[in-house]
Amino acid sequence: MFNKRNLKWLSVLATIIMAFVQLGGALVTKTGSEDGCGSSWPLCHGALLPQNLPIDTIIELSHRAVSGLSLIVVLWLAITAWKHIGYIREVKPLAIISIAFLLVQALIGAAAVIWQQNSYVLALHFGISLISFSSVFVLMLIIFEVDKKYEADELYIRKPLRRLTWIMTGIVYLTIYTGALVRHAKASLAYGGWPLPFHDIIPHTEQDWVQFAHRGMAFITFFWIMITFIHAVKNYSENRTIRYGYTTAFILIILQVITGALSVMTNVNLFIALLHALFITILFGMIAYFIMLMLRTIRSEKIK
């Protein structure tokens, strides 16, 4: 017999596991464990469990195990949600997107191991996995009926905020890509101090340019989210969904900037680097929820 509470717990479990997939991928890259299993996939050094287990192999194996578990749990969630609450318009598309992008993410990860892709291709891996995470995250919010609790199901988002949010989505995604590129191009400590090198602000190497591009995009992202936040709070002060949602997004980008700066200042402290990945993961999940709300508004306009 179907129990809504069980579906809630399943959605929370899937969201947490997907967050660990994101953090695990960041951990693999930050610790240089990409080749921990050699060029074997799905096996590790040609075996299910190799006899020799150095730390890079353990990290890579753990990431693969969590990724495999995420596929099982997300598939379980997608099927259950489809069957029992598929009447909610967004549930079926979100279920399809979560599974599809999880599979694409796995294929890119496998290709990276087997064929050793370049940094610019590898950087797509994190962004694609974020889309899958965001789908699961939004699905969880729907299951918990956040819409009804905060009157989001009756919300009308006017065009100015929609434009600001669409542009914010593109800017944030580009920033995520450049951030992933920083990791894969081994450019975390390139381009000197933060926010700019004191001795020479002109980038010289490819790593310098990658780091420079990421900092530039981060700067644009921070100010654009701040502008969007101010507009949202000023014009939708009566609506808790907008007020709480965009305030959370602004807090997350502040934390993202702080951890980004601390990563440079601490020579990429692993804990800070993982927090950096976690904050952007949650932020993108919030943006995905904003997109769902905007699409509802657009559909309501077409009906009228």
Swiss-Prot record:
Disulfide bonds: C37-C44
Residue ranges, Extracellular side: 30-67, 115-123, 185-215, 266-270
Cellular-component GO terms for this entry: plasma membrane
Known pathway: Porphyrin-containing compound metabolism; heme A biosynthesis; heme A from heme O: step 1/1
Gene Ontology MF term list: metal ion binding; oxidoreductase activity, acting on NAD(P)H, heme protein as acceptor
Main location, first listed in the record: membrane
Residues the entry annotates as binding heme o: H63, H125
Record-listed E.C. numbers: 1.17.99.9
Cytoplasmic side: 1-8, 89-93, 145-163, 237-244, 292-304
Main enzyme class: oxidoreductase
Catalytic activity, as annotated: Fe(II)-heme o + 2 A + H2O = Fe(II)-heme a + 2 AH2
Membrane-traversing stretches: 9-29, 68-88, 94-114, 124-144, 164-184, 216-236, 245-265, 271-291
Any single biological process term in GO: heme A biosynthetic process
Subcellular location field: Cell membrane
Annotated heme b binding sites: H214, H276
Catalytic residues as annotated in Swiss-Prot or TrEMBL: E60
HAMAP family linked: HemeA_synth_type1
Notes concerning its domains: The N-half (TM1-TM4) and C-half (TM5-TM8) domains are connected by an intracellular loop. Each domain is formed from four-helix bundles and they align in a pseudo twofold symmetry manner. The N-half domain is the substrate-heme O binding domain and the C-half domain is the cofactor heme B binding domain. The cysteines of disulfide bond Cys-37 and Cys-44 may be involved in transfer of reducing equivalents from quinol in the membrane to the active site of the enzyme.
Subunit structure, interactors included: Interacts with CtaB.
Summary of the function given for this chain in its UniProt record: Catalyzes the conversion of heme O to heme A by two successive hydroxylations of the methyl group at C8. The first hydroxylation forms heme I, the second hydroxylation results in an unstable dihydroxymethyl group, which spontaneously dehydrates, resulting in the formyl group of heme A.
Family in the record: Belongs to the COX15/CtaA family. Type 1 subfamily.
Protein name (database record): Heme A synthase
Source organism of this protein record: Staphylococcus haemolyticus (strain JCSC1435)
Gene coding for it: ctaA
